[in-house]
Amino acid sequence: LGDVYKRQGYGGSCFPKDTKALNFQSDHAGVKLKTVKATIDVNREQRIKLIDKARRFFPDFRGVRVAIIGLTFKPGTDDLREAPAKQNIDILLNEGASVIAWDPLGVENFRKRYPDCAINFAENIDEALTDADVCFIMTEWEKIVEYPLDNYKKYMRRPLVFDGRNCYKLSEVEKHEIFYDSIGRKIVDTL
């Protein structure tokens, strides 16, 4: 994965299940596949990396309005299996955050799978960002990749953006008044 897959972890129905199965089978056979175990462990850590990064601004998230952009594990699907969004949302809610989420396909599936999850859903990205203290990008939907960077400053209280999918080119981000932290790349702070 390494440099090829600089993101906040993997999800879906196959790779997480397959790595866990391979790890189980190797343990059962008395063979320790350290790289497989390390992959599983690092993926678990990567899934909440954005929250860890945001703690420089918010030691806890009590009273913080959080925009979650993208709920699914990848674009083009409503599949939420092993998607990082749910784990992050749980942490944020447990710490007292107010969460509003947007996803073009995943909202209805999210509501069905997690009916007791106390978050709000936005009709569009603008609505999700309105008055948000921080934004976490969890899925690299085309609508996000093409979303105008100026709108983060326009709609958010302070444009603090943590991108788990590296949706934007850093050279483009640098042209806007924004704090932008992504995975495996330098921080852009033009505030």
Predicted regions and their residues:
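Structural/interface elements that position substrates and couple domains in central-metabolism enzymes
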Residues: 3-191
